[in-house]
Amino acid sequence: PKVQAAEQTPEQILAKMNLDQKVGQLLWTHVYGDSADDTTYASDNQAIFGPGVSTPAQAVKKYHLGGVLYFNWAHNFSSENTDVTKVAALSNGLQAAAKADGNVPLGITIDQEGGMVSRVGAPATIFPGNMALGATGNQALAYSQGQVLGCEMRSLGINADFAPVLDVNTNPNNPVIGLRAISDDPNLVAQLGGAQIQGIQSQGVSATAKHFPGHGDADTDSHLGLPRVTYSRQVLNQHLVPFKTAINGGVDMIMTAHIVV
């Protein structure tokens, strides 16, 4: 039988890229439109990317983007009764644009945590959220939830999920984490969060441990202001427990928090 040639190594790919392409790989952003060639939101895309960039595909090509992040407010899809076929077609179109530009696969990401932060709605599976998962204390259930999240996102052409939340929920007045957190027990967060990560990544989708080094003690919504956490090093070490477990378990990505520690 014919022997298939080995894929190029990262070093071989980098050797063929110019400086602009290398810089572009560091950029992950949103694009407007529900298809790669959608011109409906040309003015929105031009406001971000400049003249001549009217479609999502043009943005990927011009700036050699490393990744895109899907949002319903960017008109990539509707969060209610999501047309999954169109989302998959959008992903395929953007990957084709990336391949034509430099043959480097595009990172396509989303915040699909389950619970209150679930960008894709029905027919995707709707989960009750991490606090409910934490109440079960069941690692097998956490792994299964991760599997479902990974499987469904992969079917949409999404290859990285900005989940799970590994914040230790030590502040009951936290306005932005709350139900998104598994528990106020760092060891339980580590166990169930680690299981979620393994479940997501078992489906060929990268999981993301967030929000490093821990957003669970904040009292400000980081989307509206800059939270400051002033706990001791001993307390910080407790917030780091789930992230250490995730790193040792081989999590693909880590998202930093918008906080001052």
Indicate residue ranges for each PLM-predicted region:
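Enzymes and membrane/adaptor proteins characterized by extended Gly/Ser/Thr/Asp/Glu-rich
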Residues: 32-49, 58-192, 211, 216-230, ...
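Oxyanion-binding "anion nests"
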Residues: 246, 251-261
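Histidine-centered catalytic micro-motifs
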Residues: 209, 241, 256
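Alpha-helical scaffolding within the catalytic cores
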Residues: 9-14, 51-57, 237-244
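Mature N-terminal segment immediately following signal peptide/propeptide cleavage
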Residues: 6-38, 61
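Short, well-ordered coil/turn segments that N-cap beta-strands
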Residues: 25, 66, 102-106, 158-159, ...
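Sec-dependent signal peptide cleavage junction
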Residues: 1-9, 73
